[in-house]
């Protein structure tokens, strides 16, 4: 297979990059009590000794904390990016300097270079895969099926990846077990809602230097991510409009007090459009034709297919970089539509993208770490297919977080527990 070289050999000044990345990783670790606790436990018990972990993730400081936690547990790790624009090269270089880690991630790698890096990870013959978006798992199945027999299992971080895996599982095409980390409460209720809401809005505001107050903000999709974006935007005094295709979610958004309408109508009134659906062609030519001059378009879904930029380019008479991270498309009538981060994941792919807040990702990556531990320890218990994260693992992460926050909570008495498990007690 054609593979890419490690990041350190591709940088002009790898030592300087490592120093910058190391500082970012150390700062993240200082604010990640869950991973810090797991790192101490893993270092003592070596639960991943002898394993090789292949990863395709957003390679930035918080991810690096997860990578180093698993390396300290005894694993050899090979990692690359899961999005062409989300890698922080300094962080990648700092990881590559670790004796048990090889990093192939580099910002800007796309097309053939992107998949060469994935192939480089797979050349390490991983026994566990840790994925964000599903590209690593699908590359294994489509191009390197000879690796499947030695892969214990994997984990998937994000909504889009889980959707892809479930579709694969429905077709009986998924040949090893994968935990749907995205769907477990300690990830979904915090990372998807608070993480996406805060980081997407913060990155849009910093990239454009515009305020949310008084803006008509169109949120496409009212799943966990869209719910978080809508809540945070409303909290900054924006007027929130929600578009949906699922009637119950549309009703939920309506009952939460948001305006709900089809995208064709929202296109005529929105100032800022933010897609959170995980689907393609959410905003297309027909919508661009209705939009006002100066609108801002951004995507918080995993792939760059939600805002159809081919349609927009066909409509435009000129394009320019209006500001770093902002691509302006001028239409024939003089209207200008502004796309952030090339339509990619705005909270990570924008020039100032830092991703979700550290504390939120500590929870998600804590779940990732214990899921990998579980796969290795109990490898015979999981058949091929998508698996929910065992509830006891999710609770373990919640307990570590509460202890770190100094929060105490009640426990059921034996009598209460017996009552909850019984069916004989009626009126």
Swiss-Prot record:
Cofactor-binding details, from the entry: Binds 1 NAD(+) per subunit.
Pfam families in the record: AdoHcyase, AdoHcyase_NAD
CDD domains: SAHH
Reactions catalysed according to its record: S-adenosyl-L-homocysteine + H2O = L-homocysteine + adenosine
Annotated residues for binding of NAD(+): 158-160, 192, 221-226, 244, 279, 300-302, 347
Main localization, broad class: cytoplasm
This protein's GO CC annotations: cytosol
Keyword Cytoplasm: yes
Binding of substrate, residues: 132, 157, 187, 191
Cofactors named for this entry: NAD(+)
UniProt superkingdom: Archaea
Pathways involved: Amino-acid biosynthesis; L-homocysteine biosynthesis; L-homocysteine from S-adenosyl-L-homocysteine: step 1/1
Sorted UniProt keywords: Cytoplasm, Hydrolase, NAD, One-carbon metabolism
Any one Gene Ontology BP term: one-carbon metabolic process
PANTHER family: ADENOSYLHOMOCYSTEINASE (PTHR23420:SF0)
Task performed by this protein: May play a key role in the regulation of the intracellular concentration of adenosylhomocysteine.
HAMAP family found in the cross-reference section: AdoHcyase
Protein name: Adenosylhomocysteinase
Organism listed in the record: Halobacterium salinarum (strain ATCC 700922 / JCM 11081 / NRC-1) (Halobacterium halobium)
Protein encoded by which gene: ahcY
């Amino acid at each position: 297979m054609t593979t890419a070289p490690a990041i350190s050999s591709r940088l002009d000044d790898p030592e300087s990059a490592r120093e910058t990345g190391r500082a970012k990783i150390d700062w993240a670790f200082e604010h990640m009590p869950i991973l810090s606790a797991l790192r101490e436990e893993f270092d003592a018990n070596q639960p991943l000794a002898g394993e090789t972990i292949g990863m395709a993730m957003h390679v930035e400081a918080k991810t690096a904390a997860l990578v180093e936690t698993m390396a300290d547990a005894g694993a050899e790790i090979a990692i690359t990016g899961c999005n062409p624009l989300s890698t922080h090269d300094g962080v990648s270089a700092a990881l590559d300097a670790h004796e048990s880690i090889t990093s192939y991630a580099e910002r800007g790698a796309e097309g053939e270079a992107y998949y060469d890096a994935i192939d480089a990870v797979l050349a390490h013959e991983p026994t566990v895969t840790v994925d964000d978006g599903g590209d690593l798992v699908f590359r294994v199945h489509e191009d390197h099926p000879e690796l499947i027999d030695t892969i214990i299992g994997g984990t998937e971080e994000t909504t889009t990846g889980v959707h892809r895996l479930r579709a694969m599982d429905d077709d009986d095409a998924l040949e090893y077990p994968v935990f749907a980390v995205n769907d477990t409460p300690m990830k979904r209720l915090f990372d998807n809602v608070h993480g996406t809401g805060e980081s997407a809005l913060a990155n849009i505001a910093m990239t454009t230097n515009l305020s949310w107050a008084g803006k008509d903000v169109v949120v496409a999709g009212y799943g966990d991510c869209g719910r978080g974006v809508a809540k945070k935007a409303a909290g900054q005094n924006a007027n929130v409009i929600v578009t949906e295709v699922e009637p119950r979610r549309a009703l939920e958004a309506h009952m939460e007090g948001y305006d709900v309408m089809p995208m064709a109508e929202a296109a005529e009134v929105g100032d800022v459009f933010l897609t959170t659906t995980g689907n393609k062609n959410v905003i297309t030519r027909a919508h661009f034709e209705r939009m006002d001059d100066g609108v801002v378009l951004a995507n918080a879904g995993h792939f760059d297919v939600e805002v159809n930029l081919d349609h927009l380019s066909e409509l435009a008479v000129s394009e320019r970089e209006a500001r770093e991270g902002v691509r302006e498309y001028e239409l024939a009538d003089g209207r200008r539509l502004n796309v952030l981060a090339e339509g990619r994941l705005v909270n990570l792919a924008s020039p100032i993208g830092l991703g979700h807040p550290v504390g939120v990702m500590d929870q998600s990556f804590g779940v990732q770490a214990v899921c990998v531990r579980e796969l290795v320890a109990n490898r015979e218990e999981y058949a091929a297919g998508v698996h929910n994260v065992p509830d006891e693992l999710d609770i373990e992460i919640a307990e570590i977080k509460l202890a770190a926050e100094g929060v105490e909570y009640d426990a059921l008495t034996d009598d209460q527990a017996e009552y909850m498990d019984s069916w004989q007690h009626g009126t």
